[in-house]
Amino acid sequence: MKVSDIRSKFLQFFESKGHTVVRSSSLVPANDPTLLFTNSGMVQFKDVFLGTDKRPYTRATSAQRSVRAGGKHNDLENVGYTARHHTFFEMLGNFSFGDYFKRDAILYAWELLTKTYQLPAEKLWVTVYAEDDEAYDIWAKEVGVPAERIVRIGDNKGARYASDNFWQMADTGPCGPCSEIFYDHGPDVWGGPPGSPEEDGDRYIEVWNLVFMQFNRDEQGNMTPLPKPCVDTGMGLERIAAVLQHVHSNYEIDLFQALIKAAARETHIDNLNQNSLKVIADHIRACSFLIVDGVIPGNEGRGYVLRRIIRRAIRHGYKLGQKTPFFHKMVADLVEQMGQAYPELAEAQSRVTEVLKAEEERFFETIENGMSILDAALADLKLKGGKTLDGELAFKLHDTFGFPLDLTQDVCREQEIGVDEAAFDAAMNRQREQARAAGKFKMAAGLEYTGDKTVFHGYEKLELPQARVTALYVDGAAVNAMQPGQTGVVVLDNTPFYAESGGQAGDQGVLKAGNAVFAVTDTTKIQADVFGHQGTLEGGALKVGDAVSAQVDAQRRARTVRNHSATHLMHKALREVLGSHVQQKGSLVDADKTRFDFSHNAALTDEQIRRVEEIVNAEILRNDDTHAEIMPFDDAVKSGAMALFGEKYADDVRVLSIGTSKELCGGTHVHRTGDIGLFKIVVEGGVAAGIRRVEAITGDNALHYLQGLDARLNEAAAVLKAQPSELVPRIGQVQDQVRALEKELERLKSKLAASQGDELAAQAVDIKGLKVLAAQLDGADVKTLRETMDKLKDKLKSAAIVLGAVSDGKVSLIAGVTADATGKVKAGELVNFVAQQVGGKGGGRPDMAQAGGTEPAKLPQALAGVGEWVAGKI
């Protein structure tokens, strides 16, 4: 039974039992910053289990794409060296949200395994939590599993409810016993049943875990029965495939065998049992699907984990002798294996391939040097009998050659060498401290505040006649009063000032209280809902408790909101022009411009930029209303609002609809698209592999920019004596004229060289039968010197010649020696003799050599000594 059949039969079975088939969620968990990657089937249902989300179904089944690499759940170092560890895997699961419970969950599992998959019942063992008599009785009395194949597992991890058979989401919250199903590979494989001293052997392999959430655990450890118990099960697709295909290792199943053959093809390896091929086959799945879900190789967070996995795959290819990019070529093979089950992979094939290729090319530039240093260090360490690689060297490999620590550890582990992680961490921390010391932190960061939250009124108004000062800070410390000339932070109970958030810059403006005037230069958040107004008290005194009027700089805000609203329209347009893979990776919106970073693997063409501009300006011309609405997060996503990967959103979110764009956004915006006025992209470039950046301007800024371009166009046309509309053909004419003049100049230089050759030949001096000439040619370039040298050597027949010239304060030298004299006089030595006297050096062949110098005043004297130097050589 193929992997694809196993997957589809699982989903079809549970669909026939009234379950809704739910598509795999993204590998980047939505609305959960605590989790690096989706690592199990229950992640997308977490809020349902917690009771904070409701679905239109109470039974669900899924095949969930999962990754365990980095963070708490990290299998990376074992991948390729064991039979069942993977960075990427698929988790088959069925879920009950207050619907069925233990009995049905157990009966469903047994029916699927023994009837649908036709596994021999006598090969299956089960475990239950020691105190879960209910589950035990179902297995024994209803299913009919013999008592000798049912194992009770108690609290075997040193604490109450700390057990392999008791599942907890966290220290508090939903929890409950679980029942695991094991497959017995038979006596030919070493190992004992679960719960025995030999349980870590490979004979008994866990294939399915049935979790019964029936309690809520409080902070004191008390267990309270849940009003609606739930079921969460998980079965690794790769594991059950190995069982059903009668192989012992996951890497022997059909899907992996196809990928291993592809890895062997690209690395030109015949032996398919190499561990490195398994690593590469595993890693192409993780890397490809992470890129599909919007992760881009980078230096932090999810992007860094992706980069580590890519570079580990490259290193294993390098180990097999592959010295050029190969990894990206396997994407097509992966699409062939998994593209039907996951159409999003097939749709993103080109983008995934190009992102991987760019990352490969980048790492292949440094891997050879890095590996040479590491191999030499390991050889030296072994020679000295050492067992631990210096952490400072590991950090150098990380910092200079892009070797993640676990890649270095991987190489060392193969040679039974450890790495001094403490020294590595110390070096890393030193670098971070240096970077931190060099950085400048905003004044509002780290201020202690325990007062009321700030109420924001800036969506509706730019001025408040009265607000109360709730806190003042000078030099980072809370004060009761601020004096004239002091710079600090003012916190208000109410404000129209927008605090920097979501990429939008904070407002500027003024606070007034009697004769006190506080000029606000920036607004940031001290806490989530506490706004710090940064600036300087220009006059009067200001105290905590004072009533102030607050007025935002209206012109600056207007420019900022134009840019912010245009960013939304541009984001939508970029997705329309480039594809749905475009995702925001960063933004900065202020009064001057909008800067937008997004995922894309190639520079935008001029035509693509024009198309984006046309789409945005068409939205502006339609002059549609802007509409903001507060709604529950799930309702917002269901309505089509775009949410950013990895962002943490509140239960209720603000949905901004502007033109055809709909996004979650808490920023300030125009009332109608026409208020933006005009949109123009002014910069496009790359900031990292797979990340592009555009900068754009709007309104009067865009108008002034275009007026400036128009003025420069008219100026250029005037210089060339043409109308602006005739500028391009006129430039073509000028270029043709320049090329003709350059050609004529070269002809004249050649003619001059020929005439100079005749004149200079007469100046040659005979020294012991060899013609010797040293001369300075004013105004000659290197090409002229070389042509003159060729003519002189041809004319003098047997000669040693040095020619020099001065241009832009630098000396150019060329030396030539005819073939009959190179046994005694070498052109390289001759030119170096002269060059050293004019502040330079040079060299070349025995018959022709060049040099340069920086001291032109010494050239005549240096040339004058050539005759004596040659005489000393012959």
From Swiss-Prot:
<dbReference type="GO" id="GO:0000049">
    <property type="term" value="F:tRNA binding"/>
</dbReference>
<protein>
    <recommendedName>
        <fullName>Alanine--tRNA ligase</fullName>
        <ecNumber>6.1.1.7</ecNumber>
    </recommendedName>
</protein>
<dbReference type="GO" id="GO:0004813">
    <property type="term" value="F:alanine-tRNA ligase activity"/>
</dbReference>
<keyword id="KW-0648">Protein biosynthesis</keyword>
<keyword id="KW-0820">tRNA-binding</keyword>
<dbReference type="Pfam" id="PF01411">
    <property type="entry name" value="tRNA-synt_2c"/>
</dbReference>
<dbReference type="GO" id="GO:0005829">
    <property type="term" value="C:cytosol"/>
</dbReference>
<keyword id="KW-0547">Nucleotide-binding</keyword>
<feature type="binding site">
    <location>
        <position position="665"/>
    </location>
    <ligand>
        <name>Zn(2+)</name>
    </ligand>
</feature>
<dbReference type="InterPro" id="IPR018165">
    <property type="entry name" value="Ala-tRNA-synth_IIc_core"/>
</dbReference>
<dbReference type="InterPro" id="IPR012947">
    <property type="entry name" value="tRNA_SAD"/>
</dbReference>
<comment type="similarity">
    <text>Belongs to the class-II aminoacyl-tRNA synthetase family.</text>
</comment>
<keyword id="KW-0963">Cytoplasm</keyword>
<keyword id="KW-0030">Aminoacyl-tRNA synthetase</keyword>
<dbReference type="InterPro" id="IPR018163">
    <property type="entry name" value="Thr/Ala-tRNA-synth_IIc_edit"/>
</dbReference>
<dbReference type="InterPro" id="IPR018164">
    <property type="entry name" value="Ala-tRNA-synth_IIc_N"/>
</dbReference>
<dbReference type="Pfam" id="PF07973">
    <property type="entry name" value="tRNA_SAD"/>
</dbReference>
<dbReference type="GO" id="GO:0045892">
    <property type="term" value="P:negative regulation of DNA-templated transcription"/>
</dbReference>
<dbReference type="GO" id="GO:0006419">
    <property type="term" value="P:alanyl-tRNA aminoacylation"/>
</dbReference>
<dbReference type="InterPro" id="IPR023033">
    <property type="entry name" value="Ala_tRNA_ligase_euk/bac"/>
</dbReference>
<keyword id="KW-0694">RNA-binding</keyword>
<dbReference type="GO" id="GO:0005524">
    <property type="term" value="F:ATP binding"/>
</dbReference>
<dbReference type="GO" id="GO:0008270">
    <property type="term" value="F:zinc ion binding"/>
</dbReference>
<feature type="binding site">
    <location>
        <position position="568"/>
    </location>
    <ligand>
        <name>Zn(2+)</name>
    </ligand>
</feature>
<dbReference type="InterPro" id="IPR009000">
    <property type="entry name" value="Transl_B-barrel_sf"/>
</dbReference>
<keyword id="KW-0436">Ligase</keyword>
<dbReference type="Pfam" id="PF02272">
    <property type="entry name" value="DHHA1"/>
</dbReference>
<comment type="function">
    <text>Catalyzes the attachment of alanine to tRNA(Ala) in a two-step reaction: alanine is first activated by ATP to form Ala-AMP and then transferred to the acceptor end of tRNA(Ala). Also edits incorrectly charged Ser-tRNA(Ala) and Gly-tRNA(Ala) via its editing domain.</text>
</comment>
<keyword id="KW-0479">Metal-binding</keyword>
<dbReference type="GO" id="GO:0002161">
    <property type="term" value="F:aminoacyl-tRNA deacylase activity"/>
</dbReference>
<dbReference type="InterPro" id="IPR050058">
    <property type="entry name" value="Ala-tRNA_ligase"/>
</dbReference>
<dbReference type="InterPro" id="IPR018162">
    <property type="entry name" value="Ala-tRNA-ligase_IIc_anticod-bd"/>
</dbReference>
<feature type="binding site">
    <location>
        <position position="564"/>
    </location>
    <ligand>
        <name>Zn(2+)</name>
    </ligand>
</feature>
<feature type="binding site">
    <location>
        <position position="669"/>
    </location>
    <ligand>
        <name>Zn(2+)</name>
    </ligand>
</feature>
<dbReference type="InterPro" id="IPR003156">
    <property type="entry name" value="DHHA1_dom"/>
</dbReference>
<keyword id="KW-0862">Zinc</keyword>
<dbReference type="InterPro" id="IPR002318">
    <property type="entry name" value="Ala-tRNA-lgiase_IIc"/>
</dbReference>
<dbReference type="InterPro" id="IPR045864">
    <property type="entry name" value="aa-tRNA-synth_II/BPL/LPL"/>
</dbReference>
<keyword id="KW-0067">ATP-binding</keyword>
